Amino acid sequence: TRRVLTMQRLPGLHLNEWLLTEPDQAARDQAGQLLFDAFFHCTFVLHRLQADPHPGNYLFMPDGRLGLLDFGCTHALDADFCQALSALWSAQLRDPADHSAMHQAYRDLGLIGPNLNEQDFCQQLLPAMAERHAWQKLPFTVAVYDFAQHPPYPRPSAEHQRQALRHLQSLPEALPYVDRAYLGLIQLLKTLGARVRTANPWIR
């Protein structure tokens, strides 16, 4: 055969076991930084997402490195999808938010059709998505973010849900994988109580 599967044994502890060793804040921050950087590097550079963000898929190694386990669930990301995702998140961060760029990114992602013009997008869809956008961008609004303080994922009102369903046309195949992995990352960082430098080349 031209392909041979190999395995490598990694020393280290899973998250809960590692936390029982009472790592200091610097160690928690370092581990959180590695998790954060790995997610964005995989998404925007490798275009290949480890789509199962279960804590058991990470090892905290004695030398401070992060071990990634179990690549049985990965998802390939299209370069155009990643570019549109980067544009959307970046547009949210501008002060004020760049609604025109957000509208275009929503179209590029296939979330809305050509019939939803920018004015209706801003007046009807964006208010329904505002809480979700605010939650998503919060870590990127400061240079170092304390994930221990990150709020729970917002639950939209029934009216906002109706508005979103009325205007959202379809869901890109890759988006649920990215959202699930991002939510998993946030939960890991919150459990760690990590303070992370969130500046990166893709969301700015």
Model segments located where?
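Conserved helicase/translocase P-loop NTPase motor core
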Residues: Q30-L46
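Conserved hydrophobic/aromatic residues on the N-lobe beta-strands of protein kinase domains
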Residues: L5-T6
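Hydrophobic residue at the +6 position relative to the catalytic HRD Asp in the kinase catalytic loop
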Residues: G56-F60
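Short amphipathic alpha-helical surface micro-motifs
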Residues: H41, Q50, S157-H160
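Catalytic-loop of the protein kinase fold
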Residues: V45-P55
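Helix-rich C-lobe and terminal helical cap/extension of kinase-like folds
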Residues: T1, L10-L34, M61-R204
